[in-house]
Curated annotation (Swiss-Prot):
Pathway: Carbohydrate biosynthesis; 3-deoxy-D-manno-octulosonate biosynthesis; 3-deoxy-D-manno-octulosonate from D-ribulose 5-phosphate: step 2/3; Bacterial outer membrane biogenesis; lipopolysaccharide biosynthesis. NCBIfam families: KDO8P_synth, PRK05198.1, PRK12457.1. This is 2-dehydro-3-deoxyphosphooctonate aldolase. It catalyses: D-arabinose 5-phosphate + phosphoenolpyruvate + H2O = 3-deoxy-alpha-D-manno-2-octulosonate-8-phosphate + phosphate. Belongs to the KdsA family. Its main location: cytoplasm. Gene3D superfamilies: Aldolase class I (3.20.20.70).
């Protein structure tokens, strides 16, 4: 089946094109750390020839505990993003949590992200779609792959077909997520690019009582499984010191492992996409 291509500047995002990377950190902890993280991503992706979009959140609106760090907020977050874009000349992606934020974020960021927990909130979906920006739609942990069609239709009816789907795992009992690899094939029927959010798929929601646990040691194994499915690319979070990260440290790749990690995945992506398509239906 034909696969759509979404363009962000010079980057082409499609399931049948070389992998792209949406990568960065979970939340903006500080301006200096954001610059450090982006600099390393840029160095590695330029060396390996991987198209790159910087990712971070200005607000984590769905933390487990009221005492958990949320981020610098919208205004300061946009200032940091603008500096990153000026300094490194990279496209940006961040998530939007309320309808009134959509237009403000779309003025700064090249891609706006619909959070998984909010993916059925029609007012938010429509507000984001009406900006005309490219939208990365996270698949909710509680939705079946085929149900993503309804969210795509909401965006299309609001006049936006610049859409990307992102798998981040499905709830499996309590405090656990699993990734159904068959779901990628289901979502490919919609013809939009699909990313795999490998770090969030390793979450153990509420696994540490007041915050999420995770399985960082398995990040390469799961990333290889996802990339083997002929996807548009990977969504990845890394941190200089994951054990002391302010959010989702147990899932984050160590920043100093970024280059060997991505080198293996790029080689795998090239191998998988070199094979002819075999129709088995």
């Amino acid at each position: 089946m034909a696969q759509k291509t979404i363009r962000v500047g010079s980057i082409e995002i499609a399931n049948d094109k070389p992998m792209v990377l949406f990568g960065g950190m979970n939340v903006l902890e500080s301006r200096d750390m954001a610059m450090q993280v982006c600099e390393e991503y840029v160095r590695v992706t330029e060396k390996l020839g991987i198209p790159y979009v910087f990712k971070a959140s200005f607000d984590k609106a769905n933390r487990s505990s009221v005492n958990s760090y949320r981020g610098p907020g919208l205004e300061e977050g946009m200032r940091i993003f603008e500096e990153i874009k000026r300094t490194f000349n990279v496209p940006l992606i961040t998530d939007v949590h309320e309808p009134h934020q959509a237009a403000v974020v779309a003025e700064v960021c090249d891609i706006i992200q619909l959070p998984a927990f909010l993916s059925r909130q029609t007012d938010l979906v429509v507000a984001m779609a009406k900006t005309g920006a490219v939208i990365n739609i996270k698949k909710a942990q509680f939705l079946a792959p085929q149900e993503m069609k309804h969210i795509l239709t909401k965006c299309e009816e609001a006049g936006n077909d610049q859409l990307i789907l992102c798998e981040r795992g499905s709830s499996f009992g309590y405090n656990n997520l699993v990734v159904d690899m068959l779901g990628f094939g289901v979502m490919k029927q919609f013809e939009y690019p699909i990313l795999f959010d490998v770090t969030h798929a390793l979450q153990m929601p509420g696994g540490r009582s007041d915050s999420a646990g995770g399985r960082r040691a398995q990040v390469l194994d799961l990333a290889k499984a996802g990339i083997s499915q002929n996807l548009a690319g990977l969504f990845l979070e890394a941190h200089p010191d994951p054990d002391n990260a302010k959010c989702d440290g147990p899932c984050a790749l160590r920043l100093d492992k970024l280059e060997p990690f991505l080198a293996q995945l790029k080689s795998l992506d090239e191998l998988v996409k070199s094979f002819p398509i075999v129709e088995t239906a």
